[in-house]
Amino acid sequence: MTNKPLEKSIENVLRQAVEDEGGLCLKWVCPGHKGVPDRMLLFPGGIIAFVELKRPGAKVKAGGLQNWWRQRLAEFGFPCHEVNDKYQAQQLAADLSAESFRRQTEEEEAMKAWHFIGDHSEGPDDEESDD
């Protein structure tokens, strides 16, 4: 019997780490399309990433369907990560959470600036005319 963690145990760590960081870790099942990544990660601020899980030491085959999907998703601007150990799973969740926080902060600042610029309590439309 081996002490190496199985892909399922890495998947459990990823799911828990993503949820702990405030994201969703959805199992991606796509009938009729073999080789799609195992998980889709969603974080506030529009952060979407895909994850192909492998047991430790295993890699995505260069000419396989999983690699084709990784390239195809990248063409659409979606990152696809390969995770094959528990540390990578935890680090990916932390990195995506940090990016989510950064985007939300930028959006909040942009909205504050927009409201400030758009707040004209006395402007040309508010002036009385001498008609």
Give residue spans per PLM region:
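Catalytic phosphate/metal-binding cores of nucleic-acid and nucleotide-processing enzymes, i.e., regions
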Residues: M1-D131
